[in-house]
Amino acid sequence: RLMLQRMDDLLSEGEDFAFETTLATRSYVKFVERAQAKGYFVTLLYFWLPTPEQAIERVATRVSEGGHNIPSDVIRQRYANGIRNLTTLYTPICDYWTIYDNSAADGIHKVAWGVKDEIKEIVDPLSYQKIVDYERD
């Protein structure tokens, strides 16, 4: 709640800002639309992992380093919802978006990018297809 209030305050003040989300909820759609109505250019950077198990491993690593835990079933649910919402709700409304594969040890790799509902380039067709296919399951 505190973060949402801060985001509303920054929006009202016309400040530039960024926030992190799994996209597992639809609640940011209205926020994006409100921001755009106020003249904001909304950029979405989506850091994708090919499986929910990789997300579970990342959380386990974070916990071993003193971070907070998230139950595996919650991670799986957020993972599925986030991927489904990515191209059905969020990329169609964001002014610019990029999807990155964040699973490689040598850094992130661009998968695709676009402007609203127009895909400008699919850099990694195999990964992009995995994302699209996951939504259909």
For each feature predicted by the language model, list its residue ranges.
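Short, glycine/charged-enriched secondary-structure capping and boundary segments
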Residues: 32-35, 58-61, 113-114
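A generic structural signal for alpha->beta connector loops
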Residues: 39-41, 93-94
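NTP-dependent small-molecule kinase module
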Residues: 88-137
